[in-house]
Regions:
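Bacterial N-terminal signal peptides that target proteins for export
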Residues: 1-9
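Beta-edge loop/turn motif
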Residues: 54-64
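Residues immediately within or flanking Cys/His clusters that coordinate Zn2+
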Residues: 28
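Cys/His-rich metal-chelating microdomains
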Residues: 37, 66
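C-terminal partner/receptor-binding element of secreted or periplasmic proteins
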Residues: 114-152
Length: 152
């Protein structure tokens, strides 16, 4: 009887351990601001490393720029993905298109481009307003944290 109880408790312990590990892995693959999955949004990802060494991944510049503006004094470094190539870049060297008809992640969309010419071509097809990095930070700081929810 004691052996059966020990086996049962051992099974329950390991089941809870595996469930917790699975939950942690799932949460690590979600945007830390809005909770959107990072998988599927790889070309819009935005990462910030804070002074204490904590690294946060956001699904897109909508979330990343917001956190960058609200925690600017604690930001050590950041990087964002170029929407076209998917390459990591310094956001300060990027051009951003705001509120285009294309919404790959959050809405209103902020989409980063490593090349201003590519941003202009994208804008011709999908609309939106072009901002430099500094302009994007200034504009994003004026906006609320969350997303626009159509029809709500």
């Amino acid at each position: 009887m004691k052996r059966n109880m020990a086996v049962l408790f051992g099974f329950l312990f390991f089941s809870l351990l595996f469930a917790a590990a699975g939950y942690a892995a799932e949460m690590a693959s979600k945007c830390t601001l809005c909770g959107m999955n990072i998988a599927g949004n790889e070309n819009t990802a935005y990462e910030i490393v804070y002074m204490g060494g904590t690294e946060e991944t956001y699904c897109c510049p909508h979330c990343g720029l917001y956190m960058h503006t609200t925690k600017k004094d604690s930001v050590k470094s950041s990087r964002a993905r170029d929407f076209i190539s998917g390459e990591w870049m310094d956001p300060a060297q990027m051009t951003f298109v705001f509120k285009s008809s294309a919404v790959p992640a959050c809405s209103p969309s902020w989409i980063g481009f490593g090349d201003k010419t590519a941003a202009k071509k994208f804008q011709k097809g999908f609309g939106g307003t072009i901002y430099s990095y500094e302009e994007a930070l200034t504009e994003r700081a004026k906006m609320p944290k969350g997303m626009e929810m159509k029809g709500m």
